[in-house]
Amino acid sequence: MVKLAEYPRTATFAWSPDKVPVLATGTASGTVDADFSSTATLEFWEVGSAESGPQGSVTADAKFNDLDWSRDGAMLAGALENGVVEFFCARERRSVARVARHTTGVRAVRFNAKQANVAVSGGSQGEIFVWDTNKISAAGYSPFGPGTAMTPIDEVQSLAWNQSLAHVFASAGSSGFASIWDLKAKKEVIHLSYTSPHSGLKNQLAVVEWHPSNSTRVATATGNDNEPVILVWDLRNANMPLQVMSQGHSKGILSLDWCKHDEKLMLSSGRDNTCILWNPEEAQKLTQYPTRGNWCFKTKFAPEAPDLFASASFDNKIQVQTLQNLANKLDLDETAFKQQESEADFWNNVSQSESKEKPVVTKIQAPAWHSKKSPAAHWAFGGKIVRITSDGLGVSVSKPHIEGFEKNVMLDEALQSKNFVPIINKRLAQTVTPTNEEDWSLLESLSMDGKDTYLQEALSFDDNEAVDSQPDTKDEDFFLNLTGQYEPSGEFELDAANPGITLNLLKGELSKAVNLALEKDLLLESLVIALNSDDDQIKQKVKNAYYTKYASNSQLARSLYAISERKIEDLVDNLNVSQWKHIVMAIKTYATEQSKNSLLIRLGDRLLQAGQRQNAVTLYLAGQSLDKVASVWLRELPALESEMRSHKNTLNEAHLEALTEFVERFTVLSAYINEDGGAKLTNEELVSKFLEFVSMASSSGDFELALKFLENLPGDNEQVKTEKQRVLIASGKCATTSATSTRRGKYGSTTVAPGVPGMPAAPMPVVGMQPPANPLADRTASYGAPGYNVAAPMPPPNGRPNPYAAPAPAYQMANPAAHGKYVNSASASPGHNTPRGSVSMPHNPYAPSTNGAGAVSHNSYAPQHVQPAGQPQNMYGVPPQRNFMNQTQDKPPVNPAATNVLSGQSPHLNRKANNGWNDLPEIVKEKKSRAKPVSTAPVAVASMTGMQASPNVTGGTIPPPPITRVTSNTSIAGSPMTPQKLSRKSSVVQTTALNAPVPVNPYAPPVTGRNAVQSPPLNPYAPSGAHAAAPPTGTYSPHLAGQAIDHTHRATPLSNMAAPPQKAMPGPPPKSMARKSTTSEKDIDSANQLLSSIQKAPNGGPPPRKQVVAPQPSVHAASPVAEPVAIPPQQQLIIEFFKEELARVTPLVPPEYNKQLKDCSKRLNILFTHIEKQDLLSAPTIEKLHTIVALLREHKYSDALAVHVDIATNHVQEAGNWLTGVKRLIGLAEATSS
């Protein structure tokens, strides 16, 4: 290959400093185009695309003598023949400044190698000027000179900056010598001249070039034809050259270029029409390239692709070649083939064939960048690049910043906190297409309203849609029917026209009467007869006759057929898609539960084919089909990636951004749609996309995020197995991962996770009665999960800790109960069978299950053989499934997300986050309770945990005490851990001496009136005493009677033997048949003071007085009731303006946009609430809202939208759902402004 590219231009040129370089060419001075045009043009060419012409062009002020590109790639400078130095913006490809400082034509211009904004230019009469491109646009700007010269200088033809010192440069020209200038000294500091040893005459040093790394070494070349030589100087001995290269050019040299990547390579070109490659260190000629048709006045290496070089000649060609342009076997074969062609073929093609002359190679020398490769392998993974040094003795590890490979911190935090609002706001501010914006708006609605509310609004009829809704007039019709019924009167005769029908009616043979009526087309009469018949076949026959006659022509009859026969599929498949909401209504009303989802999906497919893409997605969501939504998004992914290419520098960046956006979108959707269910990815294309994202996350070093997604991919997929093993090894978690690790599911089910293939099993020690690190993640369901009060083996001494276990909590927290959704606070204390000296260790998610041999898995609150009345059961009969991205939350995160992160809107997923240990529900609903009959006294069971902890107590158990006729309202022994503060945070309780119960003695006599111990305050959320037979199951339920534990001796082991039953103490009858509500504000404000310990003496004694026990002191003081905050007047202006603007646009908005208007109003109210409470928005955000208000007043809607984007980008934690309301108000205001 002779050349890579050839551009038909007589022009000087400059390379861009890019890995894939661009060549800029400027029309050369003193030349005439083929069309005799005098226009000077700066053109940009991409290497390899010469056939398609230049990629851009700029008209210059005059033709070019020289052209140079700044090292940062931002600016080009042209030395023009009219004395002007013109500067061009490379990115925008336009002229930015023209400064005429030279008195005659500018001969040379060069940018500084260290400071990209500094340049130097030279011309005739010794004019040299230094430029600062940061100031060239200022009015009256003028460059400055370098200082005083040693001797007078004539024309400056060549300039070069020192590659190490930014203040030193060299010049050469027609004066016969070269000068070294120091801008700090402001003068010429060194004078170079050369006298030929052959002629004794001084040679003209016309060209100068600096060494790429040595600041004291410079090369010069002579421009005369008598003795063309290249001289290499060491400035420490400026009297004589270090090297002389003379056996090369036959005429004067016009250009030099010293390779920046290899100091042993130098290019030269001259008046002998040739380019030569030299080794200046050894003064040896390496390669002489083919002769050109005219002078080669410039040659240069590409700065970042040194394998390429370009040469410009006056033969109207700029050639781009490679250093590896050497003769090979293909060239020899082509030459042999040409020698065999006929004379006629030769003469026919001779005018069109190009010269295939090859370079003459004197010595083959590999460039330095080919010989510096490490003898060992290089590899990159986890965001790091590992290199073995060239000497093989060291290792270099670096973490480069690559666009698109940054850690996705926002997604990682969202998965931990379940708050996806920041991601939604970010994507809404950076939407790519209108369809993409609709998807993220859908997700925002889901985050704010929840799935059910969103679907209800999306599937409901708009205000402008015709839906006739008649008021219910059943009662009025009843009275009308009473007075308006038909009452026969007068004589009449039987119908003589239809005697058969009449006769069969009189005989009661209704079937025959119907047949005769249908034969005579008496359809109405047939319907009346069928209504009086109990035979369904007769009714069906008449209906079929009606449908046959009218259904093909009557739309009402067709609808009656579909509804009457329950053929909803006919509506789904055949009704016009414009009436799809009516079809949805029919599906919801008449379809079976098993078929609803499939029918919604079928209707969604029809809408998608009809082009109603967003409505189809809504129906897929209603039909619980994430796979369908994923297929739609996957089909649109290539188009989205293509759209992103215009905003990214490379195709790879666009691909990674499109992939990340898709994964975020699907993850957010799955989190909101599968809030109560589980989802495993099964779609192969979807799995492949998530695997690609996992690989990208691993490449950036985000192994935790990669593992979260891998948990939700099918485990039987070989690629998933391989990727998971690779991530585990890279993250350092594989060394202690067992082959089969047991972990407790979200609802208490024990699941066995497959380990990494080939890794040894390392069972972890099991520590009894230790709480999980995350109590919300390890709740136990009510369908038979193992109990926690189980005898556990002692941990081995000096056991090796689990490096991946979460850190132990700062306080002792209760274990979940085996039954019930809420955890009884009694389990806060250790089990009675806990051995003394048990080491408190964090919950180990990899520990084997405790329900093996010898383990007890029954309820820790009731004997196994007793089924208490009112025992809460799982209403669905199956364990609740985990949702798509929450399966990995079973294991406590290594770095839990902060709980006090601000957010503009509480995420919908947190609605049920209060089901955790000792947490109050977010919304306390008053439950209706029926009147309770007088019940028997509760069974006082002492030390229940001790009973069930022993595996020997299975068959024979101590019976309960006899039932008495006296009902008791006596308080059962309360839990030693009572709620101290109504908070969503887990309670941290400290027990005081005031209400500390005494240690339990299973052999002590029954408690009497004298030695009865005062119980701590009962929990207000415990069931009333009337539910005597039901064991406590709620979080705040008290212990059973007599089960009091000394908090000061938690580790004291107690006997495994159960205590004898104690007689229940009777009490007065219940005060009320209805359960007292506990949801009033007064109750909530003083939750710890609602109940008191009430005990009664044995039978026969007087009833004891009620003793009110002071509430326990809490670690966290109760929060005072928030008082109204005064809104600053400046912020009140924001509320007033938005309300006024919303009121202005409301009557102007078309009816079809009423939903958007309502949504805008709802979101703005969220903003108003935050301003009124002063609880979210920071001062910068408030200031930007003021800016939006000011811009809207001036009708600058695009500027206001830009401020909105700024808030969404830089204030993510504050930009909640209200921000979309501001955006929509801006759009509505702009649309209605004219």
From Swiss-Prot:
The residues bearing each WD repeat, given as ranges, are: 5-46, 59-98, 101-141, 151-191, 200-243, 248-288, 291-331, 378-398
Q: What membrane topology term does the record carry?
A: Peripheral membrane protein
| Region (Disordered) residue spans | 822-870, 1053-1115
Q: Which domain of life is it from?
A: Eukaryota
The UniProt record lists the keyword Membrane: yes
Query: Where can this protein be found?
Result: Cytoplasmic vesicle, COPII-coated vesicle membrane; Endoplasmic reticulum membrane
One MF annotation (Gene Ontology) recorded for this entry? structural molecule activity
- Please provide, in alphabetical order, the Gene Ontology terms of the cellular component aspect for this entry: COPII vesicle coat; endoplasmic reticulum exit site; endoplasmic reticulum membrane
Question: InterPro entries of this UniProt entry?
Answer: Sec16_Sec23-bd, Sec31, SEC31-like, SRA1/Sec31, WD40/YVTN_repeat-like_dom_sf, WD40_repeat_dom_sf, WD40_rpt
* Keywords, alphabetical: Cytoplasmic vesicle, Endoplasmic reticulum, ER-Golgi transport, Membrane, Protein transport, Repeat, Transport, WD repeat
The question of whether Transmembrane helix is a record keyword is answered with no
Record-linked PANTHER family: SEC31-RELATED PROTEIN, SECRETORY 31, ISOFORM D
Q: How does it assemble?
A: The COPII coat is composed of at least 5 proteins: the SEC23/24 complex, the SEC13/31 complex, and the protein SAR1. SEC13 and SEC31 make a 2:2 tetramer that forms the edge element of the COPII outer coat. The tetramer self-assembles in multiple copies to form the complete polyhedral cage. Interacts (via WD 8) with SEC13.
Q: What does this protein do?
A: Component of the coat protein complex II (COPII) which promotes the formation of transport vesicles from the endoplasmic reticulum (ER). The coat has two main functions, the physical deformation of the endoplasmic reticulum membrane into vesicles and the selection of cargo molecules.
Name of the molecule in the record: Protein transport protein SEC31
